[in-house]
Structure formats: structure tokens, C-alpha cells
Curated annotation (Swiss-Prot):
Cofactor: heme
Keywords: Chloroplast, Electron transport, Heme, Iron, Membrane, Metal-binding, Photosynthesis, Plastid, Signal, Thylakoid, Transmembrane, Transmembrane helix, Transport
Superkingdom of the organism of origin: Eukaryota
Organism the protein comes from: Arabidopsis thaliana (Mouse-ear cress)
UniProt KW Phosphoprotein keyword: no
Gene3D superfamilies: 2.40.50.100, Cytochrome f large domain, Single helix bin
Family matches, as InterPro entries: Cyt-f_TM (IPR024058), Cyt_f (IPR002325), Cyt_f_lg_dom (IPR024094), Cyt_f_lg_dom_sf (IPR036826), Rudment_hybrid_motif (IPR011054)
GO molecular function: electron transfer activity; heme binding; iron ion binding; mRNA binding
Protein known as: Cytochrome f
Amino acid sequence: MQTRNTFSWIREEITRSISVSLIIYIITWASISSAYPIFAQQNYENPREATGRIVCANCHLANKPVDIEVPQTVLPDTVFEAVVKIPYDMQLKQVLANGKKGALNVGAVLILPEGFELAPPDRISPEMKEKIGNLSFQNYRPNKKNILVIGPVPGQKYSEITFPILAPDPATNKDVHFLKYPIYVGGNRGRGQIYPDGSKSNNTVYNATAGGIISKILRKEKGGYEITIVDASNGREVIDIIPRGLELLVSEGESIKLDQPLTSNPNVGGFGQGDAEIVLQDPLRVQGLLFFLGSVVLAQIFLVLKKKQFEKVQLSEMNF
């Protein structure tokens, strides 16, 4: 009897453990699948290719400007701001995944030099926290603290994103030196046109996969179209699927060519990348420079005083 109870208890514990594991997996997967920029993080070990191109451009095909502002120099173990600017016309609306029109979102990736990282909350000043707002930054990889990502966030509120950055200290990190370092940034506004698997989103142009005559255009119940094309080369019917939210440029009976646009281009966003330079300055060098400048100023003052004294002596000799 006791053995049976023991086995029953073990079975219940195993069942409970499996249930908890499944719940954790489902919750984790749901959060990952909706996270951004999960596409880049899942498919690329490093967001910046050897050519210098940031991989976000593989999905966001339109080229748009982006800018970054950082201090020229920073001291070790200090917190500074890296401000990423993603400008666009706030009146623009984009096609959402459900086919409706909505506001644009923005996102950014900041690639810092090795050793630089996101500043801990207790090192961020109240003024800087006010600029940051409710933004939540994350590392591109757990072992890549120098690469930060953010988004998607509402573009109307966060077209300027302030990253709080902690500068490294060469005294405690021997891999860091007092040098000039590059900083790279990529920023997008709006949805992408291509998914990582190569399929298109509904935020891009759809072209004809065959040349011929459009025999039928079927409007689907949940939105979108099925366009039937009679191929001019062999008479076979080819069906092109158009997702919801796109505006057709063709009509039934129209003769079209291969790769001719079937829809207008709905994309109003785009991706851009830029760079900046920052100098990790040695405090002793700054102190030495200040001492030198102070010495020069004092020398000039003494020269002026000496000159005035000499002029007084000359004047007194002339009067004598």
C-alpha cells in the first residue's frame, strides 16, 4: 500500500513538472515570437556584416536617414548619452499586418565599442531618465553587452531615442585602452518588406509571376485578392495571391507583363545607418593639459606684470 502511494506521488510530481515546463515554454515562446528585433537576433550572430552593412537592411528595403549624437570625449566609468534620431513625417500612416492603416513605429540597434555597455539604473541621473522615458533596452546577445537594441516603439513619441551608456575603465578592464573608437547605429521607421524566410509582408509591392491576360480578380472574404493570369506562353492559369491592405493597379481583362507591379507601393518607412566617433580620454592627460594651460596663463600674466614694471623703471629714469 505504501509502495503504491509512493508511485502515485512520483507520478503526480512528474505530471506537475511537465505541466509547469510546458507553461513556461509557451509563455517564453509567446514573448520571444512577439519580441523585436527577434528576426535579426535569431538569424545573425552579429548585426553588422563584414562589409559594414547592418542586417536590418535585409528586411527594410527603403533607404532613409538616421543620425546619432554622442560626446566627442568621455572619461572612464562615466555615464553619457547616445541620442539616435529617426526622422520622418508624423502625418504618414503605414499598412498594418491586418490590412488597416496605423501609425509608424521605430526601432534602433546601437553597436558600441567593446567594453561600453548599457548604464545600470542606479548610475542614470533623473534628467537622463526623463529623456529615456519608458523605453526598455536589451542586449543583442547575452554575451554582447556592447550591442543594444530597442523597438518597436511609437514613432510619434520616440523619434529620438536616448541610450544611457556606461564608459569602461581601462584600470579594471585590460582589454580597453584610451583611444578613439567608432560607434555604429541603425534605425528604422515602419514595418519591413521581407521576412527572414524570404517571404513578403503586406508592406511592399507585389509583381506578376507570369505575363498574359488577367482572367479573374477574386476579392477574398477576409481581405486581399486572388488574381488569375492566363500565361501567354503556354495558356496555363497562374494565381497570384495579394494580401490585404494593398491597392490594385490592374483590372480584369488587362494584358500584363512578367514582373509588372500588380499593386502600388504602400511602404512609407525605411531603414538607415550611420556612425560616429568617441574618444575615451585619460583623466591624467586632461589634468596635464589643464596644468599646461594654467602654466601658460600664469606665464603670460607674469610677462605683462614684468613689462609694466620695466616700463615704470624706464619712465622713472627718464624723469630723473
